[in-house]
Every structure is written in structure tokens, then in C-alpha cells.
Design a protein with these regions (language model features):
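Short acidic low-complexity segments
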Residues: 222-234
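Short, charged/polar "capping" segments at the starts of alpha-helices
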Residues: 63, 193, 213-219
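Hydrophobic anchor at the start of a short beta-strand
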Residues: 44, 205-206
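Short, structured coil segments at secondary-structure junctions
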Residues: 202, 220-223
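A glycine-rich (often HGG/GG-containing) alpha/beta subdomain
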Residues: 1-107
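Glycine-rich adenosine-cofactor-binding loop
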Residues: 143, 159-164, 168-200, 208-211
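Glycine/serine-rich phosphate-binding loop and adjoining beta1-alpha1 elements at the start
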Residues: 81-174
Length: 234
């Protein structure tokens, strides 16, 4: 048994390149089922965020496929075009990377808080789809536990640590007040809700975009307005 990892992130690729390899929750579930069906694959987890896409695979001795080639085939793209943006890790290197990553030490904003939830959600999805295995279960749970310890014991991780908090602190440092200002948040996912709540705390007038086909059921943070995504420029 062993662990392989392959990934693309903000440190090596711009957002337009990273977006080529991004997964929705549904896409990730379908991809994991196909990957797990490959010979030698015991389990797999897909971690896909705005800053990275990473695949973690628990493998048996008969494993022989290239994770990178498999990913490119699934995305319907030429492998050679993007190979330089990817990093591959195996066994100890893959484990160490996940521990550092979960602790926020490889984030654009050092020690940001969202990554722990994203790692937990990635494992939860793999578990729901019966695509993980005992090795990956233990690895991801240990990484989350270690990350929580870092958050509680390391000084630089105390306080709010997200991209939006950093942006707000930067604006306030320049003497700019958000009170009464019109702010639009594109999207109502986890990061969108975090952004909307942070802006509301600064007494901004916040509007959140939602997709029209979801507008009848989606919930937005209290005190925020909503607008269909297609009408955002009007």
C-alpha cells in the first residue's frame, strides 16, 4: 500500500489555468468513482478549492496508471499543455504536504481558516461516495487534528485569517471605511457567505448574487440583499 498525490495550486498556476482542473461536488463524486474503479486504486479523495485541485490516492502494488494522464483524460485536455503546473508527491512527501496544507501553511493567506473545513468536506464527500479507504480516512483525520492544534497553539494563527479579513484590514489600514458602502459578493458558497458576513460586520450595504435556478431555495446571510447572477451588472 502507498499514497500518491498530484495537484495544481496558486503557487504555480494562475486562476485561469487552475479553473481548467476545478471540480464541482457532483463532478468530484463522479470522478472519484471512475478513479477508484481503476486497477490498483484502493481509495481516493478529491480536494478542489478556488486555490487548488489535488488528488490523493491510496494504491495497491498492482497500481500502474498515471494520475496526471487520468485527470487530463477526464477533463478532455492535452496532458503536455499543463504538465509544468503540476506537482506529484508520494508516501511521506504526500503526507507531509497534506499536514502543512491543512494547517494553512500553504495558503495564499498564511494560516487562513477555511482550508480545514475544505479538507474535512473533501473527506466527507469521498466517504459518502464510498471512495475512500482506511488509510486515507486515518490520514485526513490526523491532518485535521494536527491543523486544529496548530490553530490553538501557534501564535500567528490566532484571530480571523481569511482572504476577506485580510482585504478588510488592508482597506482599513489605508483609511477606507466600509460603513454604508455598497458591496457585492459574487456567489453564495462557503467563501461567499464568509465574505458577506464580514462585510456586514463593518456595516456595509451587502448584495449577494445567486443563480437564477436556485433563487427560490437559497439562503443568504441575514441583512443582505440578493440579486440573480445574470443581473449583477444592471
Amino acid at each position: 500500500m502507498g499514497i500518491f498525490m498530484i495537484g495544481i495550486d496558486h503557487s504555480r498556476a494562475a486562476v485561469d489555468i487552475r479553473s481548467v482542473f476545478a471540480f464541482t461536488k457532483k463532478n468530484a463524486a463522479e470522478f472519484m468513482h471512475r478513479l477508484k474503479a481503476e486497477k490498483g486504486v484502493a481509495g481516493c479523495v478529491v480536494l478542489s478549492t478556488c486555490n487548488r485541485t489535488e488528488l490523493y490516492v491510496s494504491i495497491r502494488e498492482e497500481y500502474s496508471i498515471s494520475l496526471y494522464d487520468f485527470l487530463c483524460r477526464e477533463k478532455g485536455i492535452s496532458g503536455e499543455k499543463f504538465r509544468e503546473y503540476f506537482t506529484e508527491r508520494k508516501d511521506t512527501a504526500a503526507v507531509e504536504h497534506l499536514f502543512y496544507l491543512s494547517s494553512g501553511l500553504k495558503s495564499q493567506i498564511l494560516a487562513e481558516d477555511q482550508i480545514i473545513t475544505q479538507v474535512k468536506d473533501a473527506l466527507a464527500l469521498a466517504r459518502e461516495e464510498y471512495c475512500t479507504d482506511g488509510l486515507l480516512e486515518v490520514l485526513f483525520r490526523m491532518a485535521v487534528t494536527a491543523a486544529k492544534r496548530v490553530k490553538s497553539e501557534v501564535t500567528f494563527s490566532r484571530g480571523n485569517s481569511s482572504v476577506i479579513d485580510y482585504a478588510i484590514r488592508f482597506l482599513e489600514g489605508q483609511g477606507f471605511s466600509l460603513e454604508g458602502k455598497n458591496c457585492m459578493v459574487i456567489g453564495n458558497g462557503e467563501m461567499g457567505r464568509v465574505a458577506a458576513l464580514a462585510l456586514k460586520e463593518k456595516n456595509a450595504d451587502v448584495t449577494v448574487t445567486v443563480r437564477q435556478y436556485k433563487s427560490g431555495v437559497v439562503k443568504i446571510p441575514e441583512g443582505c440583499k440578493r440579486i440573480n447572477y445574470g443581473e449583477r451588472a444592471e
